[in-house]
């Protein structure tokens, strides 16, 4: 068998959690390959909204095995609360969730380092979620980090202490005023570590490759979005991991030739949380309406998302970098009621019109060029077939397909798993 990938093509918050939930029944294993609790995957069904931060979105399906891969960074405290939330709904976590021993741990001092580093940047801050993600990945690449497998070692606490002391020295170097009680944070951390020990740790690269040999199907689930990729995103306003398709191979230990389909998820408009370039951002009532109707607030941070028109230049870039084979468009229902819709098809950059992302994509350097499309009035939330969609939306979809060269296979018309139309 092969592995299919599911990725976000924008700046995150595209709706990946819902689509994983919809697709899970087709797969034996759902595997998360990068990121940490800075991202929230939102799922809604039976009138209840669920937000997952580290655990794969397949956990709600009783026949699926869920893997947290080696490319993920885990905060035991956040993870413990996530487990407790699932247990309230009698979700069987114990037998269906396995964690890679090679996944790195977020320490309390990683979170403090994150806060100190961001505070020291002043106006140049990048909009970090302050969850300790960046410092943890820094320790990983610097070969200083602690991994899940280290929990099983007799000298784990000594290893923790040595690393935490290094962090405190670094925090003091920043000379910022942080209010914290490290003793309380550490007590909470080690309590969560004891709970983490109750779960199954695995060598996930061996587990997944053996599963492929046995003919099992795997869906690799990404976090954040392609435009936040550490290499290919709008650097330095990016996350600390590879959110693109290549990250699935390194984050799970699977070979590139095992990958079959790549599903790219994108909103029918564009959003972004935090700082960074956003060429099609709206600052008027239209943007405010998108935010209100789309309930555009971060599922983890609660921060308001910036909203703007669909950027096809950026979308095509993400499609190409990921080798996307099928597109899933989300939140078309949010655009219902707009008389006209704008779609960005190129940029004005240094006196020229270009159709690719430039190296320096600062707002003052890039101006979007729009094509205007007719909007639709119809409420989409109750529709169940592609034929029932308004002609204007179908034309919108066709325009996107022709521009990026990849078919749109799914149209989401609401947050519930049932509000998903297969084309």
Walk through the language-model features, giving the residues of each.
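Non-transmembrane, aqueous-exposed alpha-helical and coiled segments at domain scale
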Residues: 1-423
């Amino acid at each position: 068998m092969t592995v299919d990938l599911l990725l976000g093509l924008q700046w995150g918050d595209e709706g990946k959690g819902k689509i994983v939930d919809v697709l899970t029944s087709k797969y034996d294993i759902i595997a998360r390959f990068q990121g940490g609790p800075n991202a929230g995957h939102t799922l809604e069904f039976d009138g209840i909204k669920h937000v997952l931060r580290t655990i794969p979105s397949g956990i709600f399906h009783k026949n699926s095995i869920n893997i947290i891969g080696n490319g993920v960074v885990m905060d035991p405290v956040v993870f413990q609360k996530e487990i407790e939330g699932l247990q309230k709904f009698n979700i069987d976590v114990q037998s269906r969730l396995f964690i890679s021993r090679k996944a790195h741990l977020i320490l309390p001092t990683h979170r403090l380092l994150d806060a100190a580093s961001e505070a020291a940047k002043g106006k140049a801050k990048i909009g970090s979620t302050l969850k300790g993600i960046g410092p943890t990945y820094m320790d990983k690449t610097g070969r200083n980090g602690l991994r899940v497998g280290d929990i099983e070692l007799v000298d784990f606490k000594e290893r923790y202490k040595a690393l935490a002391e290094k962090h405190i020295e670094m925090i003091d170097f920043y000379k910022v005023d942080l209010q914290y009680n490290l003793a309380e944070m550490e007590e909470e951390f080690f309590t969560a570590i004891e709970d983490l020990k109750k779960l199954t740790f695995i060598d996930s690269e061996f587990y997944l490759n053996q599963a492929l040999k046995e003919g099992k199907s795997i869906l690799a689930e990404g976090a954040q979005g392609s435009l936040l990729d550490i290499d290919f995103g709008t650097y330095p306003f990016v996350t600390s991991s590879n959110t693109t398709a290549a990250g699935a191979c390194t984050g799970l230990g699977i070979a590139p030739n095992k990958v079959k389909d790549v599903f790219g998820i994108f909103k029918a408009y564009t959003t972004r949380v935090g700082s960074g370039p956003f060429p099609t951002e709206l600052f008027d009532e239209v943007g405010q309406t998108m935010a209100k109707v789309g309930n555009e607030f971060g599922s983890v941070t609660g921060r308001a998302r910036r909203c703007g028109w669909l950027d096809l230049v950026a979308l095509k870039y993400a499609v190409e970098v990921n080798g996307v084979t099928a597109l899933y468009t989300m939140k078309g229902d949010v655009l219902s009621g707009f008389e006209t819709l704008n779609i960005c098809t190129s940029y004005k950059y240094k006196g020229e019109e270009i159709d690719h992302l430039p190296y320096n994509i600062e707002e003052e350097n890039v101006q979007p060029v729009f094509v205007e499309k007719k909007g639709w009035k119809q409420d989409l939330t109750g529709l169940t077939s592609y034929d029932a969609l308004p002609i204007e939306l179908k034309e919108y979809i066709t325009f996107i397909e022709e521009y990026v060269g990849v078919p749109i296979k799914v149209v989401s018309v609401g947050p519930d798993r049932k509000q998903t139309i297969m084309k």
